[in-house]
A protein has these predicted regions:
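A phosphate-binding catalytic loop at a beta-strand-loop-alpha-helix junction
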Residues: 124-137
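Sec-dependent signal peptide recognition
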Residues: 2-10
């Protein structure tokens, strides 16, 4: 009986380690695809500007399972992104975020955080046109979780928010709360 218990324990431990190893992405290989404003804020999440269809193919081959697109329907990617992503076996999710119309808000930040939590350790790419909206929503999430204004901005920058204009939008949004 002790032997069976030890075997089950070993299988559980090694199975968990294998699953953890599968969930981290080959960040270096993905970065070689030269995606605009590529960031790797987590071992299983990359943040980018708009990838091309070929770049999505590379990411799918390298372990990305889910795509979260923050672009609005009026922004043309030059191809049918949803169809391309799903044809590669990845799930596609869209949270349309418009900067000028108040889209940088707590509801959109929470929607993004809910998806990231739902996907657990699976490989995820989050993108908009440049990566700035990704970072802006992360800033709001960090602030909502108790981070200071400056730490929230720093974390947003780590996720791709490079625009000073958008950093100001985040500051203004957070100061209203």
């Amino acid at each position: 009986m002790k032997t069976l218990y030890r075997i089950l324990l070993l299988v559980t431990v090694f199975g968990s380690a294998a699953n953890a190893a599968e969930s981290s992405l080959n960040i270096q290989a993905i970065s070689a695809a030269e995606i605009n404003n590529f960031r790797a804020p987590e071992s299983n999440v990359v943040s980018t500007g708009q990838p091309t269809a070929d770049q999505f193919k590379i990411m799918a081959e390298l372990g990305v399972k889910h795509v979260i697109n923050l672009r609005t329907p009026g922004e043309d990617a030059g191809f049918d992104e949803k169809m391309a992503v799903e044809s590669l076996g990845m799930s596609y999710h869209n949270i349309p975020v418009s900067v000028g119309d108040g889209g940088i808000n707590a509801d959109n930040a929470q929607s993004l955080q809910n998806l990231l939590d739902e996907f657990g350790g699976d490989g995820v790419v989050v993108h908009c046109a440049t990566g700035n909206r990704v970072g802006a929503l992360i800033s709001l999430s960090v602030f909502e979780d108790g981070g200071s204004l400056e730490n929230s901005i720093q974390e947003g920058s780590r996720w791709g928010m490079t625009s000073e204009r958008l950093q100001q939008v985040v500051r203004d949004t957070l100061s209203e709360n």
